[in-house]
Amino acid sequence: MNFDWIKTRSDFDDDKPAVIDHAKQTSWTYQQLNARADNMAHYLTSQGVKKGDVIGIFAPNDIAILDLLFACFKTGAVFLPLNWRLNPKEIAAIVEDAQLKLLFYAEKHLSSLTDIDQNLLHMDIDVAQYDEIVNPDYHQPFQATPVEPQDLAALIYTSGTTGSPKGVMFSYESFVHNGANLELTYKFNSNYITIVSTPMFHVLGFNDTVLPVLMSGGTLILQRYFNGEELNDMIAQYHPTFIIMIPTMYYSTLRASNFNPENFKAMDYIIQGGSQPLPSIQAAFKQYGINIINGYGLTEAPLVLVNTPENSKRKPMSIGKAVMFVDARILDDNGEEVPTGEIGELAIKAKNVTPGYWNKPAETAKAFHGRYLLTGDLAKMDDDCDIFIIDRKKELIITGGENVLPSEVENALAEHPLVDRCVVVGYDHPKYGESIAAAIILREDEPHYAEILDQHMRSRLAGYKVPRMYVPVTHMPLNSTQKPDKLAIRQMMNDKVSQTL
């Protein structure tokens, strides 16, 4: 079967702008994008690459990522975008686990590749040789290798918040369904424009942005590295139709000196994903009359639920309903559906859900209940079938035998005007098993912040839900995908307690 859809897209939209690199001020049409991929496919074949070989790229948002993606689609090779925020040992572990054959890289990040087999370092994407290989002016058409829908197309490694990163597998079928589901849900067409600021090693940038926009014939604007001020300038210049980012990125754009709410109001969709919805984001943008929509997905099941613009005004914290061709249910610990309004684990069944983890059959089996992926997220559904995320199941704090949802504590804490941002975690306690601590970024210096916040929290929550520690931080620790690093924050709290013993 032929999954070389970029060739089909180029036949219909040959001269339409497909990709614009903002940093290089260079653009490519769909015809040129396909020509680059054809040329790269020929090159990979000349290097002995065969169907099933894993080809990696270690680079910021760059046209080379798309060259290799579509060349892999044409040759049957497996595409692996690597997270350049990881440290050398983490990268080496992924490279070994994935059984990588060749690695393309950006020279700027070469220092992070010291621990891998240096024979795998194939080519710097910024050298003249690379440009000569993919030059669309010298197009060599490539006959795509036949593949089956269930064949492995890509590996994307999780951020490893609960242990070592796992390789999430994507088949050709799951990739195409991912793009098509979102394309149909959002009614994307060739007039759509978006800026890709989220790194393309992340499903939010790759599966949820690149795939649906290019499948619909739209235009991608590449931001090489995210910067809030630069993004605001890019929005003013390119007038995107929609944008999708994680909460920390919205904070940065909002607080940049050049933030212009009118540029955001002009968009059809402004989507918050990649992390639990934050009320503070909605509230901050709402004061400018900007409506932020919540979406939901994870590496194993990219963007499978999303709210609508109208419904998000009535239910701003809902992640909405399942997108087209997705079945979402709330299950108890026995795998049975819970009644409406009750909390259970969100489970997803869809063609775009991963078939499992690379070389990890036991972990794959634990991740599924029948054909439903168990997301690890606690959720509930209301009478309108709108879904609300409550918290991560594994992040539930059990203190003195009582269950405490960190999100409930965070939401109450965020209501106080002193608190800019906060993350709540459990830490080890000799009497209660776990106790509650909050890492907070304060809006202003206040020597009595702990007493003030404690009084505020006790007026809103039961005593056992109130943090025993409030720890101010200047910057919230973030993991490699720029989400709050709760493992690091928990360790910070445990270290702080041990120093006082």
Which residue ranges define each predicted feature?
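Conserved AMP-binding/adenylation subdomain of ANL enzymes
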Residues: 176-193, 201-242, 252, 256
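Conserved AMP-binding A3 loop
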Residues: 27-31, 153-177
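Conserved AMP-binding/adenylate-forming
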Residues: 42-86
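Conserved pre-ATP/AMP-binding loop-to-beta segment of ANL
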Residues: 14-15, 139-157, 164, 187-193
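AMP-binding/adenylate-forming catalytic core of the ANL superfamily
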Residues: 86, 103, 350, 355-356, ...
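Conserved ATP/PPi-binding loop(s) of AMP-dependent carboxylate-activating enzymes
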Residues: 322-325, 336-367, 402-404
